[in-house]
Amino acid sequence: MAKEFQFNWKPTIIPELLHGSVFDRYDDESTCLELNAQVRIDENGFFLRWLIEGKDAVVLDMGQIWEARTGGLPKDGRIMFELEQRGASETIAERTIWITHGQDLVNVQSFFLVAESVELAKTCRAGINDILKSSRIRHVCPTTQLMKYHTWLTMNVNERRKIPIKLIIKTFSSGKPEKMVQKCLNDLGLGGDKYTPARVINRSMGKKFRNFYKCSRGRKRKEREELDVDILTFEKFQRLYNKICPRTEVQELFVKLSGQKEYLTKERLINFLNEEQRDPRLNEILFPFFDSQRIVALLKKHENDIKYQEDGKMSGDGFLRFLMSDENPPVFLDRIEMFMDMDQPLCHYYINSSHNTYLTGRQYGGKSSSEIYRQVLLSGCRCIELDCWDGTGENKGEPIITHGKAMCTDVFFKDVLVQIRDTAFARSDFPVVLSFENHCSKSNQLKMAKYCMDIFGDMLLSKPFEDAPLDPGVSLPSPNRLRKKILIKNKRLKTDIERHQLDQFLREGKLDEEDELNETPEVVGEDSVSPRSGGSGGTGAPEEVDDDTSDDDDDPSVQTSLNVMRTIPTVNTTSNNGSNRSARSSLDTPSPSGGSLMVPDRATSTATSIKNAVLARSPNFSSLRQKLSFKRRQSPLAGDQRAHPEVEQPVSSSSPATPSISGPPPCATSSGSTSSITITTTGCSTSSSGPSKHILGGEMPAKENDEAHPELKQNFIAKNLKGFGFSKKQPVLTKEEEERIFAEYHYTGATTNIHPLLSSLVNYTHPVKFSGFDVAEANNLHFHMSSFSESTGLGYLKQSAPEFVNYNKRQSSRIYPKGARVDSSNFLPQIFWNAGCQMVSLNFQTPDVYMQLNMGKFEYNGGSGYLLKPDFLRRPDRTFDPFSESPVDGVIAAHCSVRVISGQFLSDRKIGTYVEVEMYGLPTDTIRKEHKTKVIPGNGLNPVYNEDPFVFRKVVLPELAVLRFAVYDENGKQLGQRILPLDGLQAGYRHISLRSDTNQSFILSPVLFVQIVIKTYVPDELSGLVDALADPRAFLSEQKKRQEALAHMGVDDSDIPDVPNTRNMALRHVKQPPRQNGSSADLLANNGQTGSARGDQTSSMASSTIRSPNEQPQPVAVDKFKVDPIEVDDLRRDKAFAKLLKRFQKELDDLRKKHQKQRDSIQKQQPARRRNSSIAWIQTNVDKLITNNRRSTKKEKGSRRSLTASVSSGCGSASGTVTVSVCSPSGASCSGYSTGGPSTPVACNSDGTGSPATIGSPVPQDLVNNDRVRSLVNTQTGEWSAMVRRHDEEEFELKKVQLKEQFDLLRKLMSEAQKNQMLALKLRLEAEGKDLKQTQTKKSMEDAKVIQLDKGIKTKAERDRRVKELNEKNLKMFVEERKRLAMKAQKHEEQLTKRHLDQLEQLDKDFHKALDAEVGNYKEEQLAAQPTSVV
């Protein structure tokens, strides 16, 4: 429910109008003056009525009155004479109240009230305008509208000052029979009195008319019924309404809410107001809930039964009165007032804008009017357009306003400014923008500037504010800062050029001759290249180009239309008398009619005025001949700046011109008093002072004083349009003629020859040619703005929508209809509102659906004409795409449903009706031509629809969305409409009053009774969870009820397992693969399935690094992908590795055999030594020594003098060879002996000396000191030791090579295993992706099938939209899932790759470690080796 708001809609009525005053009345169409008319306004300000003695009252709805202004003198001389007889003639204009009224902007009627005194006229005029300024009365409730109609009945009395019963019967005739209405009147005592009107036959009637009455004298005169005004009170009228039109649908609702009782209790009423009538999204503090205290106040207002009031109950009648009261409006009532922040920069607002404001009809051949500017401004428009051209003929030297070269009538520029001045701030105080499309010469531009300054005065903003200079980065001033200011939008010179020319003009009173006649290239923005428009759509229509857009050559829509064959003109400088001299003299002499030189064949305008208030002398024209001679070769119409070059007087010595299809349109013939250069073309010639008025027969103006050329009205139509098939009996264009004119039309761009004074008046609305969004962003000039045709705007919106939105955050843009809309139709403004375009200009004279949308949108915020754009369209740190279909950050999507229940007073005819509900917003939110009720035949009074709700499931941006309610008859004619903003809409059961197609109220407004549900949008799969969170008690209570029911059926609660919510099953089914959120190591450790490490297997390999011996691998299975580590032992068991080891062993055995052969060879080289006795004796003792040594080796080990026996099993000695070493007690020498083979090596000291040793028995001393023995030992020791070292080194090198090959093979095997592991991982992930796609496809098909089978979806469009929304949601979800799967695969691959690198790195470390160990062992053995010998 809405917060309490004091809605006081009643205006203040001054006593002179409330009690009535006497005026004399006349109108434009009458020729007589109605004297002593009693004029009054009712106490509620609904109607203005005048009563004349002996006549029926005339009642005028105040909602149809545009304004009351100071009147002029009457045109009819008889009326003027009578007014002079009744008062002072010099004060007639001041004593006159000129009231204009009408149901639309174009068909405006007027009447005049002449007061007895100037003071009375001034007071009543101000009182009427004060009533009109308030817009609250347009938003009253249905009860107040019934009161309004009751007031109309009581004021609309006949000559007997009673209410005709027929008016009451006619009220209900659209749904009820007359006898039934009459019976209800009689039941309520409203039958009235009967009387027979007297027949009055005027003697002045014609003979046939008198004979008609004579023939009917025998007929019975029909009796009439009338009712006293005092009898028909509002209470009785309400009872009559409820009796004739019982609200059965409200009664059904009441019975449902009351629980079959005759009243609503306080608790039920509170629950209804807080649950049904409240938007759940509202803040509880700003919009408090209803409590008992507010219910008591509510009952006092609407419940008439005192007992019910005391008991806190509400009856059915009281409930109906509440539903139809001001406390139950469809829109928050504070939205009617000024509720928006008006201190933001000007570009942050939508501005109500008009296109070609001067036109009252079609774009071609239409009528121009200055009066329509008043209606447009009074209707709330804040940006109006003025197409300014040089006047021709008698109006030469005066700027006019017309649609140039489109055969439209003209109005004076000065007259339009007066109308703007009088009405600019009559309804709204916020600034008005005048959009000039300037085609005038500099002299007329000077007049335009002077007219603006003189007429507007202080209202004109002639220079920027000091705190808001025209500098880069400076924001525009706010609407509050610009209150009651008029801004001019016109091209402007560059700053330095403007300053120079303006100083010269103010100093000398004129400009240089070159500046006067040449186009000025120093216009800001005109030297930049504009991007070509992409938007004509291939229609071939000439695109109208605004003054700040591209030239015609830059617009492809213009280029494609220029397929008209043009004939090259010839210049005839001979005047009417054939004198070339007079023609040449006209170049040197100023024209008598205003001093203008007309050169119609220039590509750009050279027409300039030399006569104005500040010029001291006339320029010398003799210097222009060379320029003119060149310009004469140009096309006469391509760049002509005249408004109507086609109506100039043809002068040619040749035969009369014949109209040609390929040439320009035929021209009017008129004589003129001045001479100029005459251009002759095929089918068209011009003369000096030919008229420029174009009036089509079908659009004859009603008032002469509203045209710049009224004298052309008759002769031009009758004589000069015959070439197009026009005649007196054919006042309108045929389709073929219109197409012909349209094909030959060529739009002329606005002039760049700007007068510095007019340029200096442009400030915050400086139009420039659009050069691109990046250029505009780089310049950062907020006061620059650009205009786009709807085609061009759609092109930019299609290509660069976010950039367009950002552009509109900083500066303004204006959108106008494309030139192909010759019927003045409109485009959908919502498209450009979505992009933040401020001035979306429409044709106000055409009240189509799109104009209704514009009027309905700007009806709020006090009707100021300014609406603050949503936050995301203003903040520079936010990015917004108007084509987005997903919710915007910070904006909560809404869900809206509308159920049309019934209607009241929809039509005054007994005809079938239906209701259509549409939504306009973002493209994804816009729903049109889908939701309509069934036709209820033969009842235009109170049809009951009771349709199923029209559901708008997901509204992405509620702030931009509006609802449109429209009622049509069975033939498709619109009966009423209403535009309501979604962000201000109230939920619950509401009555919606409808408006006319021009957004005006009716005397008895049609009303729709609807139920509106607004809440936060929740996806279907989460609705159950949201409901449970919103009301957990109800959710648990429902669960408990079901549990008790199952227990009653014998089912134990323990037998029921917990199951997931079916609403989330589909979502869970898609999301079943779990996501891993651990570290990368954990993620990889849980990945993979390993098998054998053999290279020929394609199964998964282990994915762990080479671990230390104490580290134990721990394989874990995740996502059905088991991982085991790669073990080196597994790799060593590979066939290739076993084969390599076998080859290594063979190589080693071969090397050892080779070494053994070498040892055997050395032993064979010393046979003589063994025969020596001493050696033999040594040998014998050595054998004994070996025998003893075996017994005592362990005991004597480590002794300084010891016998060491070792069995060598390594390389360097034969198997089973025993080596014995004998050392002296001092340790200085030793002798080595070896046995067990053919030869025995003996170990000696390093110097080759041996010491005598006692082995078993003492060694003879002489043997030890024997030189021969010593030399033999030394020689044998050296040879043998060298051989042993060489063998050891060869074996070491072989081991190194084998170790390297071994680890190379391990590396190769590991790489293959890693490759297989990676391949298995990819195959697994691909399988998961394939499974995911299959699951997603299955889900999409199942969801689409559910939607197709959903019986709650009524229309195909809704079903398609649901499927599209579902597909988009699924697509987004599927993309996210696939992204997660891809990220998971990427992480797995990255981690596996890292682990593979670690494994290879560890393998390299192990290789180097093994190599270092081998080298260390080899060095250690070398250090521990002793010299050995064979003896």
UniProtKB/Swiss-Prot annotation:
Phenotype reported upon loss of the gene: Mutant worms are similar in size to the wild-type but animals are bloated with eggs due to defective egg laying with decreased body flexion and sluggish locomotion. They have defects in the posterior body contraction step of the defecation motor program and become sluggish in the presence of exogenous betaine. Animals are resistant to aldicarb, a carbamate insecticide. Simultaneous knockout of egl-8 and snf-3 results in uncoordinated, hypercontracted and paralyzed animals.
Disordered: annotated segments: 510-601, 632-692, 1072-1119, 1150-1176, 1188-1216
Positions annotated to bind Ca(2+): 356, 385, 387, 437
Tissue-specificity statement: Expressed in most or all neurons with high expression in the head and tail ganglia and low expression in the motor neurons of the ventral cord. Expressed in the intestine (at protein level). In males, expressed in vas deferens, spicule protractor muscles, diagonal muscles and a male-specific neuron.
Coiled-coil spans in chain: 1135-1166, 1288-1318, 1368-1402
Record's compositionally biased regions (Acidic residues): 543-556
CC cofactor: Ca(2+)
One GO CC term on file: perikaryon
Occurrences of domain PI-PLC X-box (ranges): 340-491
Catalytic activity: a 1,2-diacyl-sn-glycero-3-phospho-(1D-myo-inositol-4,5-bisphosphate) + H2O = 1D-myo-inositol 1,4,5-trisphosphate + a 1,2-diacyl-sn-glycerol + H(+)
EC category name: hydrolase
C2 domain span: 877-1002
This protein's name: 1-phosphatidylinositol 4,5-bisphosphate phosphodiesterase beta egl-8
Taxonomic source organism: Caenorhabditis elegans
Species lineage: Eukaryota, Metazoa, Ecdysozoa, Nematoda, Chromadorea
